[in-house]
Amino acid sequence: FWLDKYHIDGLRIGALSSMLYLDYGKTEGEWEPNKFGGKENLDAVDFVKRLNTAVHMYHPDVMMFAEENTSWPKLTHKIEDGGLGFDFKWNMGWMNDMLHYMSLNPMWRPFNHDSLTFSFYYAFSEKFLLPISHDEVSHGKGSLIKQMPGKYDEQFAGVRAFITYMYAHPGKKLVFMGTEIGQFDEWNHEEAIQWDLLEFEKHKKLRTFFKELNKFYLDCKPLYELDTVWKGFDWIHHDDYANSVIAFKRTDKNGDEIVSVCNFQPIRRCLLYTSPS
């Protein structure tokens, strides 16, 4: 119905773990194992496979997303290869790590450097989407800019650093509405986005930043062509804890490269890194 009548671009299956595991959120005695003695919900697995197959058959341009917070394997692999057939998995680990890291006073970030780099260890195990969704800017959590530490100007700088790093990181991008104008109030489904903020210079410049970054991203194939495989990524420097800096290289199918150097301290740096290649 949603695909046929409203022509939506994709479907997200939320809380997928509660479907896939018979014991999810239950204590001993509240669930029974499957016929093989395991905790996997075989009926749910079959339903998900059939759902993804049907969507891709009748609407091949529609994307299917999995929000799953465990390490269920092969969510985005082909069904014939033992997968569940989703197009992308929400990278909840990256999201939680980065929101925690960016909320820290910069002086504490050197002690939490692993939150910045850990996602690269599994970045290519699935086809990932990097999500900043409605869940992260509502329910008392505050908007993205409100979660940034420091004074007014520093919060805008925090958003720019976070989003630029997000666009350089392997994985597709999802940014929730209102983030692009620096809305300080968290999202409320009963209210509109506060477009009047664009009367203020900082908010207007932030929207321009998003506009230019999106254009740069679309024009820069190394940032997305090999988004799901190690071939498109190389570390240059990942353990500069003291300076809160990481550097890496992205590559496209033709071998063209772009280098990303991310500084998460409010201090100008002059650093020399040597690429392993």
Locate each region found by the language model.
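Conserved small/polar residues in nucleotide/adenosyl-binding loops
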Residues: Y273-S277
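Active-site groove signature of glycoside hydrolases
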Residues: L3-D23
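Conserved, mostly hydrophobic/aromatic
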Residues: W2, I13, M64, L213, ...
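Conserved alpha/beta catalytic core and glycan-binding cleft of carbohydrate-active enzymes
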Residues: H7-D9, T27-H189, L218-P222, D227-L271
